UniProtKB/Swiss-Prot annotation:
Function comment: Anchoring subunit of the major fimbriae. Regulates fimbrial length. These filamentous pili are attached to the cell surface; they mediate biofilm formation, adhesion onto host cells and onto other bacteria that are part of the oral microbiome. Fimbriae of P.gingivalis are major virulence factors.
Pfam families registered for this protein in UniProt: Mfa2
Protein encoded by which gene: fimB
Annotated signal sequence range: 1-22
Name the record gives this protein: Major fimbrium anchoring subunit FimB
Lipidated sites in chain (S-diacylglycerol cysteine): 23
Keyword terms, alphabetized: Cell outer membrane, Lipoprotein, Membrane, Palmitate, Signal
Recorded family membership: Belongs to the bacteroidetes fimbrillin superfamily. FimB/Mfa2 family.
Entry membrane topology: Lipid-anchor
General remark: The name (major fimbrium subunit) does not indicate the abundance of the protein, but is derived from the greater length of the major fimbriae. In strain ATCC 33277 and strain ATCC BAA-1703 / FDC 381, major fimbriae are 300 - 1600 nM in length and about 5 nm in diameter. In contrast, minor fimbriae are only about 80 - 120 nm long. This length difference is observed only in a small number of strains, including strain ATCC 33277 and strain ATCC BAA-1703 / FDC 381, and is due to a loss of function mutation in FimB, a protein that restricts fimbrial length in other strains.
Length: 303
């Protein structure tokens, strides 16, 4: 093929592409401007933690002005930490809403994969018989922005800000083994149980709490006669209702505690850690409660 024929073929390809692409060079009025989207993560103290690795993955649902899903995007930890922009272009809607959720577990991703409308988007905890699995370190955020038309030049870059949606809990129960032995001869886990609750089990896509009430079972261990839980996460309660920590033996609820000895309630704070310290060793029950920054366990003086 000589140069003249190559030129003619190239021109024809460009003309056909222009006809089907909808953006003719002589008239850009119907052309959506491309733009870029980035994700930015914040902690409870409004510190930018995008680059810390706290966000492992993000799923971003894109809805038009009617709430209909038009796209679904995924980002991994490296992309988020590097603030890598996603190039986007949407032709048709006047506005789009980006509904971003970070660190959903595989079950949540599977449940939301085929959602086609924002009103049907929920992030529900896995649970059995009212006992929920501890959620991951969930973040979420929503950004609504107009789609710019009339040019093929780069449009305004956009950033969706995401914030933590769970609270951490850490529990220490001094003298727990001795207390158990005083209430029966058997060993864990045959007859004893510890439950913390209740919270709703569901977030809507727009981060509103709904759903059924659930409890959590701390997966702790007995160390030198004391029960010590790992750090675990819970959904917040409704209307700052306090959590109740219940201790069972032989299926009977023997203790139900919802406040410290000073009256401070067990209220989980989003993006913070709720520390619960219970001392069963003395004649009188002693309960301490404090709220500390994320991942910071309260150190209690021993006496």
């Amino acid at each position: 093929m000589n140069d003249a024929k190559k030129y003619i073929v190239s021109v024809l390809i460009l003309l056909v592409a222009g006809m089907f692409g909808g953006c003719i060079k002589e008239d850009y009025s119907d052309c959506p401007r491309p733009f870029r989207l980035t994700v930015r993560a914040w902690d409870a103290d409004m510190q930018d933690i995008t680059e810390t690795g706290a966000v492992q993955r993000v799923v971003i649902f894109v809805f038009d002005e009617t709430g209909r899903r038009i796209d679904r995007l995924m980002m991994d930890a490296a992309q988020v930490a590097a603030r890598k922009p996603i190039p986007l272009e949407y032709d048709g809607p006047t506005t789009v809403s980006f509904v971003a959720w970070a660190n959903p577990d595989d079950h949540m991703l599977e449940e939301t994969a085929n959602v086609q409308n924002v009103k049907d988007l929920f992030f529900r905890l896995s649970s059995t018989d009212g006992i929920a699995q501890s959620p991951g370190d969930l973040f979420s955020g929503v950004l609504t922005c107009p789609i710019e038309y009339g040019s093929i030049e780069q449009g305004t870059d956009q950033t969706v800000d995401i914030y933590r949606r769970t609270a951490q809990v850490h529990i220490i129960i001094r003298g727990y083994q001795e207390w158990l032995e005083a209430n029966g001869p058997r060993q864990l886990p045959d007859y004893a149980d510890i439950l913390l609750g209740e919270t709703p089990d569901t977030y809507t896509g727009l981060a509103e709490l709904i759903g059924n009430a659930v409890q959590y079972r701390p997966d702790g261990q007995i160390q030198n006669g004391d029960f010590i839980s790992p750090i675990f996460r819970v959904y917040p309660t409704l209307d700052t209702t306090p959590l109740h920590l219940k201790l069972y033996a032989y299926g009977q609820e023997l203790l139900n505690i919802s406040t410290g000895s000073d009256g401070v309630p067990f209220i989980p704070v989003i993006g913070k850690m709720l520390n619960i310290y219970i001392d069963l060793r003395g004649a009188n029950l002693n309960v301490l409660v404090s709220v500390t920054p994320w991942d910071v366990v309260q150190q209690y003086a021993e006496y």
